[in-house]
Amino acid sequence: MDLIWLIPLLPGLGAAVNGLLGIRYFSKPVAAGIACAAMGGSLLLSLFAFAQLLGAEHREHIVTIANWIPPIPLETVSGVGQFEVPWAFRLDPLSGMMILIVTGIGFLIHLYSSSYMDHEPRGGYVRFFTYLNLFCFFMLMLVLGSSFLVMFVGWEGVGLCSYLLIGFWYHKKSAADAGKKAFIVNRIGDFGFVLGVFLVFFTFGTLDFREVAEAAAHMPVEAGGFGVISLICLLLFVGATGKSAQIPLYVWLPDAMEGPTPVSALIHAATMVTAGVYMVARNAVLFEHAPNVMFIVAVVGAVTALVAATIGLVQTDIKKVLAYSTVSQLGYMFLATGVGAFSAAAFHLMTHAFFKALLFLGSGSVIHAMNDEQDMQKMGNMRRYMPVTFITMFVGSIAIAGIPPFSGFFSKDEILAYTFQENKVLWGLAVITAGMTAFYMFRLIFMTFFGEYRGPSWEKADDSHGDHGHDDNHGHAWHGPHESPRLMTTPLWVLAVGAIVAGFVGIPAAIGDFIGVGNAIHHFLEPSFTAGLAGHGDEHAGLHLSHAVEWALMAFSVLVAACGIGLAYVNYVRRPERAAQWKTNWAGAHRVLTNKYYVDELYDATAVKGTMASGRGLWTFDKGVVDGAVNGAGWLTRAAAWVSHVLDKYIVDGLVNLVGWIFAEGSYVFRRGQTGLIQNYAVATLFGVFVFVTVYVVARYVG
Amino acid sequence: MSNTAEFPLLSLIMFTPLVGAVLLLFVSKHSENTIRWIANGFAVLGFLVSLPLWFWLDQSTSDWQFVERLSWIPSIGAEYFIGVDGFSALLILLATLMGSIAILSSWTAITERVKEYYIFLLLLQTGMIGAFVSLDFLLFFVFWEVMLVPMYFLIGIWGSTNRLYSAIKFFLFTLVGSVIMLLGILAVYFYHHEVTGVYTFDITRFHELNMPFDLQWWVFLAFFLGFAVKVPMFPFHTWLPDAHTDAPTAGSVILAAVLLKMGTYGFIRFSLPILPEATQAFVPWVVWLSIIGIIYGALVAMAQRDWKRLVAYSSVSHMGMVMLGMFALTPVGITGSIVQQINHGISTGGLFLLVGVVYERRHTREISEYGGLSKIMPAYAAVFLVMTMSSIGLPTLNGFIGEILILQGIFVVNKVWAAFAATGIVLGAAYMLWLYQRTMFGTVNNPKNEGLADLSLREFATFTPLLILAVWIGLYPKPFIDRLDTSVDRVMARVNSTYAPLNAGAADEDEAEPGGGDLLAQIDGETTGDGFDRLVRLPVRGGSR
């Protein structure tokens, strides 16, 4: 277990090698081999660590490998503390489960991608695996980080990889836009998250999860009011809504489907988008102390689940259906955390990782077969061409719809039971959502795999379409829908098995007591949610429903799911014309739903346009006013200089010149006398003598 | 280690570029490659001789290190008094590194009046280093002014379209600020004489001065004008986008990476410790100007169509962050502020270099002229991506460390300020990613871009140190932060009389007089010594008095 830091490091090294050398030098198989080997090694290490964890008495292990931010003194609420963050990793049941999900599904998706991305040119192919490895590195950091800040490293890092992978086909504007949107919307969430982290430090003087939980455990539960823990939790939850695509920050996830499908499966279904749920579960003790925020979390989760499901009902892009389904299922997980069922949330996170990764990879297989067509209206009857994809996707759909004994049933049922216990209204929303889920998933199955084939015929379809895809680089002609190669179907099989059996670790008490099996995952995970809660037993947030109620709830949710499936069957297989009828009868509602409630338009008109306009406005202000003042000062100086110049030239200098002029002009008179003629001078001399003599005589004899 | 100070290391670092510049005077202006080799050689040499600052710096002492002290103008008490602490040592290393990079980046970009160009760049190096090492306020001021001249010519001669306007604007702005700052310096100088009867510009003595609040207030304002123009803080920033846009690439790099740090350096070295009470009084004003700078700079950056001007406005935003951390007046905030000064040098310097690369190829900075460069210049796009991420503070890269420390540092002081400032992380991502998308992503629509060459080996060499530093500081900032401990303690001890540093167990706990600190009084013991004992760096605080 001391080597858990190698778990993230291996894919990190893979990314470094492929990124620094591979993009330039490696062939496709070498690059894919390195990437897969890195993930395989990481998976083995994870299994090993997990086995050790199971065997250990004390199921918590922290490994500190280095100092990151050395201690610096800083005031906190309770005096001067030390701001210090080590590179520390923490393995406990929750993170143990997560590393298995990330490395396991990550490994499968690496394998799948090595075939799926084969059409890419070599450079792009290697670049893809670099990003994918880098993503796993950051995701494992996120999961294993033992403090808020180390988690935040992974948190932001997966955001970067998401950005890069969504925009993988960056020459498409829509892809580049979607990547940017994902990053910026996530940053809005991070804004809340970092403030939450700052407040955590200010309140507790540490950022370590365990220390925070221990400190929080000794603080009163903020039942009546909205204290500092509530504020922390609310801010953290803002971060979670960004990363896990909840209202109001869910808008980036459907757009993220611009990325290659394996990316959608790994990042935007199985792992990264669950980070918010993971983070909330990681801080279970904190959230337990903020019941008001818990309620907000539950409401946001339930409403998001419902809203996303309604949008999912009408989407025709196969990946968009799955995207909204993901948003909706994440809503379920938040609903679970909100009602205090943290292990149910983690359980659903795990089963969802299996069946949603499966569904995405299956859809990728279909898209691949259809030469990059994603519109279900142009598919149909695909089960004839690709039986493996059909069977495995069918399994996934049953699992997500919540039909026993597939995995989704157990996890979703647990959430529903807890919700029922806490709040009947939210339970109602969740059940309606469950029905919709079953409907839109089977609508997807029926539209894709049943009915008439509606796609282009392949005799003449060599290159006539592709407005949806990345087929500029396809070197080969399309020969009609076909089953995918083994490298792609094998992961489907593995995940399908997982989607069937993963639920057995969380058999509810009503059934478990009946057949003599306990709820393994609940007991396994519980210590992670009560860490630091001294004296509190396992049952701090147990289910107190009678078996009869539990049975009834289960039966009801299965019934609702069955109704959803039946409705889909009737509308899309038995009488497909009815679907069109619905569309015309409810045109208004349909338009609102296909336009996703116009939320994107709203955000665009307010936040995006507002920011851009204020940017432009301020720039004008900068040029006109701020710089205008500077230039104005410059102009004034010059004007003053000009005035001085004028004054100088005409007044000051004028005076000088005037004096000069006077002398010049005055001297004119005298100049006239300077004739240069001796006789004139002689006359003048005589005249002068005469004057002097006269004056002398007069003065002498008169005076 | 302790014998290193007997060797005039700092003078060597400072004058190496100057020697290069003088040598260039004797080279014929027609042998341009010889000139380039000499300039590059001396720049790299300058960096190499500055490396001992990293390795030999004693992190355990709050004394000034590598001190040299000679008489300069005895009649007014001015001395050639130089020395460093961790803070200035790091900035000197930044200056010598970025100087070498800037000079290397000019190899093919500058083809006219090559000789004068390199002479000015090398002179600028000496000026910058001189300002960072000066412990005499007059000496500092001289270097501060000396820096102006080469930069003025670099912009005015080798700049682009509006170069004269920009050069004069840069010059006048800084000059006005520094003239007023000089008044402030003189006020401190005469006050010191009035109190002690000694005429001196010795900064270490000024650090112990307890000036009356009114005087502090006015002097703070005077210093503020000088330094805030240089940072630049809103609303004194408008010279910056013009200067950056019109300066040659190397000029922009130096300007962003080092010259702007003169302002923040000035605040931390002079305003805060000399004027602690006034500093505290001005905190809300400076903080709000910083916050306005952060948001305003980011929003205006978003509206830019000129690539370089966008980076320039992002600089305004980032420097607002630096100022904010500083005026948190918490150790974490000030540490973050200093770390972020270095980070800003790396990432913004890198971004200007990157603009320079494509500008040299296309001679346009219009963002709309580009697009799809990822396909043509993949290595360039990769470097640009790392620099972008560093600039927007992605964890594992350097910018994150600075931002998180600054925001955490300000958060414990005032949560509202922190919340406003943190919007910068959203806006920063928005304008940088949009820039990235417009230049790197999409298809190559402009035929002029089709044949662009990717990074050459020389260009790649200019980026390599920056990339390494970005990752290093991001993953393991400890060596940097450790070197700053005592510098931060020194400032904190002045601005917060109850502050007790972590690593000084024996430090004074007792209440100091307003603005005073016994810790500093101890340092005083040395600085008032007869000068020559300062030539030898004393690792132990000796009673040399």
Could you describe each region identified by the protein language model?
Chain B
Residues 234, 348-352, 418-451:
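Predominantly late transmembrane helices and immediately cytosolic-facing juxtamembrane segments
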Residues 11-26, 40-53, 94-106, 124-126, ...:
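Central hydrophobic cores of alpha-helical transmembrane segments in multi-pass inner-membrane proteins
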Residues 377-380, 432-545:
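Cytoplasmic/organellar membrane-interface segments at the starts of transmembrane helices
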Residues 1-4, 129-135, 268-282, 322-342, ...:
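Helix-coil boundary and interhelical linker segments in multi-pass alpha-helical membrane proteins
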Residues 57-79, 179-237, 242, 267-285, ...:
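Juxtamembrane/interfacial segments at transmembrane-helix boundaries in multi-pass membrane proteins
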Residues 21-32, 99-111, 153-162, 231-245, ...:
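C-terminal ends of transmembrane helices
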Residues 30-32, 116-123, 128-215, 300-313, ...:
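Alpha-helical multi-pass transmembrane bundles of energy-transducing inner-membrane proteins
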Residues 1-9, 23-119, 194-210, 510-540:
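Transmembrane helix-loop-helix hairpins at membrane boundaries of multipass inner-membrane proteins
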